[in-house]
Amino acid sequence: MSEAEARPTNFIRQIIDEDLASGKHTTVHTRFPPEPNGYLHIGHAKSICLNFGIAQDYQGQCNLRFDDTNPVKEDIEYVDSIKNDVEWLGFHWSGDIRYSSDYFDQLHAYAVELINKGLAYVDELTPEQIREYRGTLTAPGKNSPFRDRSVEENLALFEKMRTGGFEEGKACLRAKIDMASPFIVMRDPVLYRIKFAEHHQTGTKWCIYPMYDFTHCISDALEGITHSLCTLEFQDNRRLYDWVLDNITIPVHPRQYEFSRLNLEYTVMSKRKLNLLVTDNHVEGWDDPRMPTISGLRRRGYTAASIREFCKRIGVTKQDNTIEMASLESCIREDLNENAPRAMAVIDPVKLVIENYPQGESEMVTMPNHPNKLEMGSREVPFSGEIWIDRADFREEANKQYKRLVMGKEVRLRNAYVIKAERVEKDAEGNITTIFCTYDADTLSKDPADGRKVKGVIHWVSAAHALPIEIRLYDRLFSVPNPGAAEDFLSVINTESLVIKQGYGEPSLKAAVAGKAFQFEREGYFCLDSRYATADKLVFNRTVGLRDTWAKAGE
């Protein structure tokens, strides 16, 4: 990592400091355990930065472990994308990649140990009956009629489950804890269920698969994890985490600590809702630049450094809160303002003809790649008597606040000449098709000799040298800050979240590559699209505007 700022402080790091100072632990070992059933999103980035960042700062280790206990929903596609996302964010896992499926034999043995201790039983209630028997937050559950089977019978039935003797949903293994517990998670939770599905790592070896709560704690213990960090929705599950480890023969007992998950305005984080956006074609895929997925943010032009900075700024607490989208946008805007080279592109073009410029001629003007960083060098940009400017940069009449080109008045072309609007041509509908101007030949990158003041500056692209470009103006996917609270979250999709324009860019953009952003001067930050751009068709995505227009609109 390139950031050299001071180490962040939060309650988890305070716990680690105390554990190291007291000698409870001599090293720090964390893990990031995603389920490979979807693409990682910005909320996962917070967990990645926390777990890998802690390991890095304490010279410890962080494992990447795939919680692959549900073969029906998982796929190697997701495994590969998760590995790519973690590496792209700038982190490296310790040793080999782990899979929960690596421990299936040990997990099975621990399940047998619980049966032998009278702490687990095979239940033949249907899934619906199990839910009914579980009770509610205000009413205790009731015991299954199969709860008091003998150890021998449970061992035989569990082996029958393992060898495929039951159909799916006809039997499961449950922990024998307390059906009257005030914590529903402790009311005889399911430890194993039957699934006849091929697993991406183990093939068809198993037809019984352990549940998350049984797998997670044992995997942590087998890997020697010292601090198991989860989001707050797993707070009650900590009781089951500890119960399992307290009741099996295992030398290590990690501790689980919970922190608040990331909630971000104008988007959803639910994997189910994100999947619905993809499968119902509201977006183009998991890497759609409007999605909060890491792959979507990357394609939109977000940098790994900006996401790490965002995660650092929001911090780690136990308080649930919702972060303004402007906070994320501010991080990428600051990053690109500092590091992105400048270029000129016209998004809504209108032709401008300089009538007194030598006909058919052109020249090169020198432009800095960054106004404040001379080390980024400069480039030569062609200029000619016919250029494209943005339609919004010209008005036939305007008040004094309008600092662009107005009929009969002057404006400066960026790093070029002062021009004056003389007349226009319009089509049959009254739309301006061409603006005719004159230029002051003695004003190339300098003020007029007679001392007259020209306040406005607009950007431009030489028509004879322009590259046709497609510009995808991405915006927030939803029109309200909390779409998840809507009765139908799909009903509040922002219909203007993608606007496609055909414009022109300066010739230097021919060398653009995906993942490297530009500031299109006076327009915003853009990057070449990794999916649609080709050598013959340049497609640029808007990463973020030059300023927060949503805040202005809400005032």
UniProtKB/Swiss-Prot annotation:
Q: Which reaction does it catalyse?
A: tRNA(Gln) + L-glutamine + ATP = L-glutaminyl-tRNA(Gln) + AMP + diphosphate
* Binding-site positions, L-glutamine: 67, 212
Subcellular localization is given as: Cytoplasm
Q: From the record, which residues define motif 'KMSKS' region?
A: 268-272
PROSITE patterns recorded: AA_TRNA_LIGASE_I (PS00178)
Motif 'HIGH' region residues?
34-44
Organism domain of life: Bacteria
GO cellular component terms attached to this protein's record: cytosol
> What sort of enzyme, by top EC class, is this?
ligase
Q: Name one Pfam family in it.
A: tRNA-synt_1c_C2
Where does this protein hold ATP?
35-37, 41-47, 231, 261-262, 269-271
State the Gene Ontology terms under molecular function: ATP binding; glutamine-tRNA ligase activity
Keyword Protein biosynthesis in annotation: yes
Q: Which HAMAP family match?
A: Gln_tRNA_synth
Family indicated by similarity: Belongs to the class-I aminoacyl-tRNA synthetase family.
Assembly behavior: Monomer.
Q: What is this protein's name?
A: Glutamine--tRNA ligase
**Source lineage:** Bacteria, Pseudomonadati, Pseudomonadota, Gammaproteobacteria, Enterobacterales
